[in-house]
C-alpha cells in the first residue's frame, strides 16, 4: 500500500502540474487576445482558436478527471490506495480514509462543474463582446507551450504505467521498502481508455460525415424557443450557469446574492436590465 500511495501522490502531482499549466497559459492567451478575464465577455473562441482551444478543452477535461485522460489515472490510483487502506486498517484510521474518499469524490464533482463552466461559457456559444469577436489566435511563441503541455497530458494518459515506473526512484527516497509493481499493474487497464475513447470519437465522426454526405450545410443561430432575433446577451452567463451549484454550496461558500436593476444606455423609458451577482463573504485571504 505504501508504494501504491506514494506512486499515486507523485503521479497526481505531475498530472496536475501539466494540466493546470496548460490551462493557465491557455487562458492567459485568451485574456491577452480578448482583452478581458471575465467569462461573461468571452465566448465563440473555439471555432477560431482550434489548436489552443482544443488543448484548453483537453486540459479542462483532464483536470476534471474525465476517464481516458491523465488525471483520471492518478485519481484511480488514489482511490485504489484509499480503499485498500480502509480494508487493511480499523478504527479512527479507517474513518479518516473514508472521509478522504468522500472528499476526493466531492472535489471531483466540483471540478467537473467548474471547468464545464469555464469551457462552455469562455469558449463556446457566440462572442459576448466585440473584443472576443475580434480576438486573434495566439502565435507560436504563446500557443506553442500550450500545445506541448497538452501533448504531455495525452502522453501520460496513454502510458501511465511507464510514467509510474519512471517515478520509482523518487518513491524509493520517501519509502525505501515500497514496491510500485502494484501501482504499475493497476494502471495497465486504464491505459486502454484513451485508445477506446479516441476510436469511439473517430467512429462518430465517420458516421456523422457519412450521414451528412450530399446534404446542404447551413449555419444558423441555436434554437431560441422560436425567437427570431436572439442576441449574444441572451446566452447563459457564468453566474447563471453556476447558480444552482452556488445555491447548494451556500453553507460552505458563505455567498450572498446581489440583484441590481439598471437602465441600459439608449433604451426606451421603462426598460430595465436585471443583474444578479454572487459574492463571497469569506475574505479572499482565507481561500
Residue ranges and their predicted role:
Residues 1-39:
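Alpha-helical multi-pass transmembrane bundles of energy-transducing inner-membrane proteins
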Residues 13, 17-21, 106, 110, ...:
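Hydrophobic transmembrane alpha-helical segments of multi-pass transport and channel proteins
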Residues 20, 24-27, 36, 75-76, ...:
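Alpha-helical transmembrane segments of polytopic integral membrane proteins
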Residues 160-193, 209-287:
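Aromatic-capped, Gly/Pro-kinked transmembrane alpha-helices
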Amino acid at each position: 500500500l505504501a508504494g501504491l500511495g506514494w506512486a499515486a501522490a507523485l503521479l497526481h502531482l505531475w498530472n496536475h502540474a501539466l494540466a493546470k499549466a496548460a490551462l493557465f497559459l491557455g487562458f492567459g492567451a485568451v485574456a491577452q487576445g480578448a482583452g478581458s478575464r471575465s467569462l461573461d465577455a468571452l465566448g465563440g473562441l473555439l471555432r477560431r482558436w482550434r489548436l489552443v482551444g482544443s488543448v484548453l478543452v483537453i486540459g479542462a477535461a483532464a483536470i476534471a478527471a474525465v476517464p481516458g485522460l491523465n488525471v483520471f489515472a492518478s485519481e484511480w490510483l488514489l482511490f485504489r490506495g484509499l480503499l485498500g487502506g480502509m480494508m487493511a486498517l480499523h478504527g479512527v484510521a479507517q474513518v479518516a480514509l473514508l472521509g478522504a474518499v468522500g472528499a476526493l469524490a466531492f472535489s471531483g464533482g466540483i471540478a467537473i462543474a467548474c471547468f464545464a463552466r469555464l469551457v462552455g461559457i469562455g469558449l463556446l456559444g457566440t462572442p459576448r463582446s466585440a473584443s472576443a469577436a475580434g480576438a486573434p489566435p495566439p502565435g507560436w511563441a504563446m500557443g506553442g507551450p500550450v500545445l506541448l503541455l497538452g501533448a504531455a497530458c495525452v502522453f501520460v494518459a496513454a502510458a501511465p504505467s511507464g510514467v509510474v515506473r519512471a517515478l520509482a526512484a523518487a518513491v524509493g527516497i520517501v519509502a525505501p521498502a515500497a514496491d510500485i509493481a502494484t501501482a504499475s499493474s493497476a494502471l495497465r487497464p486504464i491505459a486502454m481508455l484513451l485508445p477506446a475513447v479516441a476510436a469511439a470519437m473517430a467512429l462518430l465522426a465517420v458516421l456523422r460525415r457519412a450521414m451528412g454526405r450530399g446534404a446542404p450545410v447551413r449555419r444558423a443561430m441555436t434554437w431560441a424557443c422560436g425567437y427570431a432575433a436572439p442576441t449574444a446577451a441572451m446566452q447563459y452567463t457564468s453566474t447563471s450557469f453556476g447558480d444552482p451549484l452556488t445555491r447548494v454550496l451556500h453553507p460552505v461558500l458563505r455567498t450572498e446574492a446581489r440583484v441590481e436593476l439598471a437602465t441600459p444606455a439608449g433604451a426606451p423609458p421603462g426598460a430595465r436590465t436585471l443583474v444578479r451577482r454572487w459574492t463571497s463573504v469569506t475574505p479572499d485571504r482565507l481561500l
